[in-house]
Structure formats: C-alpha cells, structure tokens
Amino acid sequence: MKVTFEELKGAFYRVLRSRNIAEDTADKCAEMFARTTESGVYSHGVNRFPRFIQQLDNGDIIPDAKPQRVTSLGAIEQWDAQRAIGNLTAKKMMDRAIELASDHGIGLVALRNANHWMRGGSYGWQAAEKGYIGICWTNSIAVMPPWGAKECRIGTNPLIVAIPSTPITMVDMSMSMFSYGMLEVNRLAGRELPVDGGFDDNGQLTKEPGVIEKNRRILPMGYWKGSGLSIVLDMIATLLSNGSSVAEVTQENSDEYGVSQIFIAIEVDKLIDGATRDAKLQRIMDFITTAERADDNVAIRLPGHEFTKLLDDNRRHGITIDDSVWAKIQAL
C-alpha cells in the first residue's frame, strides 16, 4: 500500500501521543521516523517503529529525559543521554558537533547511556547538508558472532561517513553484511539476499534472511575485517564516552539500551576553499563513474547517491508500506 508523508507522520504522532509523549516531542519524533521512511530507509523507519514503541512501553526509553553535558575539552565533549529518545538525541549531538567544528575546525561528541538512533545516516547527512564531513557510529547489544565463533559477542555497530559533495556521498553501513532491519525487509518481500548474509544451522553460508534472523548467525562484512572493525569501534565509543561496551549492554541490560555513540563533524571550508573542494570531489566522482562497466545494464554506484532519487519518487508517488507493518502500527 501507499501512504503520504503526512498520513505516515500522523500515524506515528497518534501512537506517541497515546503514550502521553509531550506534543512537541511527539511531533519531532514522528517527523524523524517519517523522514527516514520517505528517504527509502524502511528498515529503520516505519518497520522499526513498533519495536521502538515496545521499548518505550517497557521503560527502556525515557521520553522526557534531557541529555546532559558531562565533560568539555575544547573540540571534544562528553554527554550522558539519560536514555532519552534515540533519534532526537542523536540529532542534537550532531548539531553540537557541528557547533564545535565551527569554532575549532573539528568537533567530537561522545555520548553514553543512549538509545537506538534509528537511521544513523540521518546524522551524517545532517552534517553534509551544512557543508561538513559527518562521521558517526554506535555500539549495540551483541547480535553478531565474532569471526570464528557461532555465539553472538559483538555488535553490528553501524558506521556512517558523509561527504558534502553534490549530491551528498554517504556510506551508512553496519559491520554485518546486512543489518537485521534489512533482513526483515527482504523476508517481508519474499526475497533471498543478493549475496550471502549469514550461516544456516549447519554452518553453511546462506542467503535466506529468515534463517539468519532466527539463528542470529549474521555474517560480518568482509568476514574477519568487519568483525575486527566492530570490535575497535566499540572500544573507541566506550572509552571516549565512558559508557557501556557491547559486553556491558548485553550482560547488564534486559534489552538494547544504554549504548555508546560518537558524533564527529569537520568543517572542510577551514582547510580548503569551496571552489577547489567542489572541483576535487567532482573529479573523484567522474573518475569512478566513467570506469568501464562490468554489465552495461548496471550503473556504477556512488554510496548514498540513490537516496536523492528514492526521496523524489516517494514524494511524487507516495511511500510504499508493507501491509503487515501498517497493520501493526494501526493496532498500536
């Protein structure tokens, strides 16, 4: 089925207000969930909303909490999220990193005691739209086996890097081949994964999303490389925020909350003039996209460039929502 942006935002807002969330908070949170979905990231927008409400109902998320600054060291700040709403807090932290970068050239905010930020790419994009390089990542509960294991001991720990090119170039990737949200998207669509995404119960690589969702043997991207990157991202976020590691979140909490996150903004224009910046970025993009294609029918892709088209299509034709997901939201 298809819905308009306003219909989708209204559905989110209704559910949030039914939980006695303050009007302004409910409006901003509903807006962010709807924008994420409109951008084509269904896995962390509309599909994730029922899970968000479950955590809200369970008390994992404290909707009226106010993030507090703990430490300030010039370009680096440490904050405590107080388990406030994840996407609203993350937006505020990237805004703060941008403010610090305006003063110092670079700004870094380390956040502890946070909740799931939904679409991490929103915050990298937020920085790039203002002309900054945006880098952010989060740890998580243990949902992926480290390389060589079959028991979950590391997080998917998504990493975002956004560049202020035209259009914006952005990598938004979990340390697994696919996020659990994308496994769900493919399962609901009745599709196999395009490449192996995990192991089946016999330890064989599989493209079946439902199997991986059930046994939790998701595959690290790049095998041992994704496993290693997940571990060091967790270590950095834990140390800089003085927050919880994947181990602590997994062993001490009843669900995924109280995670640690990093937000970095770099003001490129303090280092290079705008015309030179744009020319250098365009040369990089042209060099890549003019390579001989392996398949004449498949374009060479630059990361994040597809979001401009997805957003335009959804605004023109309506946002496609899975019927079963929409039914869940209507029932909340």
Curated annotation (Swiss-Prot):
Source domain of life: Bacteria
GO cellular component, one term: cytoplasm
Enzyme nomenclature, EC number: 1.1.1.130
Residue numbers annotated as active site: 44
Protein name, as recorded: 2,3-diketo-L-gulonate reductase
Annotated family: Belongs to the LDH2/MDH2 oxidoreductase family. DlgD subfamily.
Disulfide-bonded cysteines: none
Organism: Salmonella newport (strain SL254)
Function (record text): Catalyzes the reduction of 2,3-diketo-L-gulonate in the presence of NADH, to form 3-keto-L-gulonate.
Subunit-structure text: Homodimer.
Binding site for NAD(+): 168-174, 224-225, 304-306
The keyword Zinc-finger is annotated on this UniProt entry: no
Subcellular localization: Cytoplasm
UniProt-listed HAMAP family: Diketo_gul_reduc (MF_00820)
UniProt catalytic activity: 3-dehydro-L-gulonate + NAD(+) = 2,3-dioxo-L-gulonate + NADH + H(+); 3-dehydro-L-gulonate + NADP(+) = 2,3-dioxo-L-gulonate + NADPH + H(+)
Assigned keywords, A-Z: Cytoplasm, NAD, Oxidoreductase
